[in-house]
């Protein structure tokens, strides 16, 4: 029921008002809306038109809700939007299970893969400059020939990863980053700040020369 207070959208006919002496039936026949007094003194619409008013109100509410939802989707945080995993992203990549996904050869500069599960994902030859793999699980992933300059592998699980001929110049691998079982043949670790135990382990398996930079893996690791 629609309550009209202060300003009415329609003029109401008081049902308690006496009919005119000159036209006894004029009010009953020409007044589309009748009103009665509520206990609080407010006029209450009692005519059949109230259903029309109610329907209009519902329609306005639905349109308002649709506009609100549309606006929220339009202004969503670019970092989490469908094409906003990074400046050159192709999909949502942060905090996702992307196991086995194929990113080979793609340009994913500064892509955000934080906390994502990337087991057996294929990044062969991908451009991943400045990408973040913070606390991500890259177990068994293929990063061969990938450009990983400036990438962040802090706390990442890089176990059994193929890093053949990957360029990791200036990458971050602090924390508990693990390279256990990874293939680093020809990988370039120039200016990568490694812990002593990480360096010792990698030097045991280091071999080859990076096909792009021409740097020997052992030299970039500062192995003795």
Curated annotation (Swiss-Prot):
Disulphide connectivity of cysteines: none
Lineage, uppermost ranks: Eukaryota, Viridiplantae, Streptophyta, Embryophyta, Tracheophyta
One Pfam family in the UniProt entry: Pentapeptide
Name by which UniProt lists this protein: Thylakoid lumenal 15 kDa protein 1, chloroplastic
The Pentapeptide repeat domain, residue ranges: 116-155, 156-196
GO CC entries: chloroplast; chloroplast thylakoid; chloroplast thylakoid lumen; chloroplast thylakoid membrane; cytosol; thylakoid; thylakoid lumen
Transit peptide start and end: 1-34, 35-81
Compartments reported by the entry: Plastid, Chloroplast thylakoid lumen
Keywords (A to Z) from UniProt: Chloroplast, Plastid, Repeat, Thylakoid, Transit peptide
């Amino acid at each position: 029921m629609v309550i009209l207070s202060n300003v009415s959208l329609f003029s109401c006919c008081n049902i308690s008002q006496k009919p005119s002496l000159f036209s006894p039936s004029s009010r009953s026949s020409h007044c589309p809306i009748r009103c009665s007094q509520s206990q609080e003194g407010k006029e209450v619409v009692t005519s059949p038109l109230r259903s029309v008013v109610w329907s209009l109100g519902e329609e306005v509410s639905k349109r308002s809700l649709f506009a609100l939802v549309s606006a929220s989707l339009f202004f969503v945080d670019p970092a989490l939007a469908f094409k906003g995993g990074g400046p050159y992203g192709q999909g949502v990549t942060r905090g996702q299970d992307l196991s086995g996904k194929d990113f080979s050869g793609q340009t994913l500069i500064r892509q955000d893969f934080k906390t994502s599960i990337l087991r057996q994902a294929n990044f062969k030859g991908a451009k991943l400059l400045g990408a973040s793999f913070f606390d991500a699980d890259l177990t068994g992933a293929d990063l061969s020939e990938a450009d990983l300059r400036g990438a962040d592998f802090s706390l990442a699980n890089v176990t059994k990863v193929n890093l053949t001929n990957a360029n990791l110049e200036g990458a971050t691998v602090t924390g508990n980053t693990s390279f256990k079982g990874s293939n680093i043949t020809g990988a370039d670790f120039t200016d990568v700040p490694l812990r002593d135990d990480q360096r010792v382990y990698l030097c045991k398996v280091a071999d080859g020369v990076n096909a792009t930079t021409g740097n020997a893996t052992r030299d970039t690791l500062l192995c003795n």
